[in-house]
From Swiss-Prot:
Pfam families: YbjQ_1. SUPFAM superfamilies: YbjQ-like. It comes from Methanoculleus marisnigri (strain ATCC 35101 / DSM 1498 / JR1). HAMAP family: UPF0145. This is UPF0145 protein Memar_1285. It comes from the Archaea. InterPro entries: UPF0145_dom_sf, UPF0145_YbjQ-like. Belongs to the UPF0145 family.
Amino acid sequence: MILTTTEEVPGYAVGEVLGVVSGNTVRAKNVGRDITAGLKSLVGGELEEYTAMLADARTEAYNRMANAARDLGADAVVNVRFATSQTMAAAAELLAYGTAVKLVPRK
């Protein structure tokens, strides 16, 4: 499975567009993390707890999108994008989406 942010895959042409695929996850903040992050925000620097949480969320959303493409029989997902939104005061959604396609080798 090829996953790319570009419209094309080098050496291949899009033979069939299967449709938009997406994967998402919603993550809630942890009270312990909030306290630690609050203290760090006073002195500056990276909020490592949130960085790790968002990295995990990005991976989960990415994998769910890839699985949705596999379920359609796709060879690739092109134009992959990520979006985030706050769903409530203490939670955020991370969405990965793109276009599932069948590829044909260029001659």
